[in-house]
Amino acid sequence: LLNTVLERKIQTRKRGLTFNVPTAVPISPQLRLLTYDESFISMQDIYERHCKQVGIGKDDPIIAWVEKMRSTWDGGSYRRTNVDFANLRMELLEEVSVKMISDKILTQFMTMSMSSPSDLWIMRKQFTLQMASTMFLTYILFISARYPGRIHISRSNGVVIMSDMVPTFSPQAPHFKSPDPTPFRLSPNIQHFIGPIGIEGLLASSFMALGTALTSSEHGLEDYLSIFVHDEVRFWFSGMQHQSKHLEPTIDLVKQNVCEVVKRARLMSCRYGQDKASITPVNQAVLDLINYASHPSKLALQDPTWMPWL
């Protein structure tokens, strides 16, 4: 449904921006068959290939992180604050990045996989556009836990698909809420492969094009999301039957969650920046989100299983 909207808008159509979801064939309530050709490879697989080549265990960075955290945090009688905790995590992230995991793993893999420099250039451009689509959905739909194993890249056409694309609810109530400190995954290896020009240029403009295309009509996005959000809220209620009678009516919860999603999509369109007569860039809201997603202080707050160094 959303792709039909993108096809009708000139800014998204000329960039080739689409949301890619693998075709699923339901076998049972717990089992689905997904389309997945041999050209796809996950970031986790790329990482494990690198670890095998350099002779380190795939869990060594996580083990080193946990052991250093435990030995430093538990040692001594000094009462540490949240600032000390954040500084320690930043030091650990820098140590793992410098000594164990380079930010060039994805770039080197893609360079070796392409047959010519022109193919690599096309792959980088297509990868940037596809990551813009996945990052956009991650942010507006409150999708969390974007582990490397859930990001799959096609080596033949640059298509990027995400598995487990499910909104995250607050534990206390059926309201969308992502616990991740970063709005989407823009880890060091993704940053290096896209490059600074691609991030500030193609990636940022794609965010704005997607947000503008989906929020240009009066109630278009709300109508598309209502059924989807309704199913998610009903699923939350089915798992909390003993508490559901004390909560608000489902119709109100659906409206609230839809409004939150639309609010984030409008933020990505940067319409507020266009209306103001200020000296700040029009896409300042998008640049702020990119900064939050790529800043080491935010990445360091992620769980080590999220692999903020990859």
Give each language-model segment a name.
Residues 1-133, 153-310:
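ATP-dependent kinase catalytic cores of phosphoinositide-metabolizing enzymes
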Residues 11, 143-145:
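Short, solvent-exposed loop/edge-beta patches enriched in aromatic
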Residues 138-142:
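Extended amphipathic alpha-helical scaffold segments
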Residues 145, 149-152:
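Catalytic-loop signature of eukaryotic-like protein kinases
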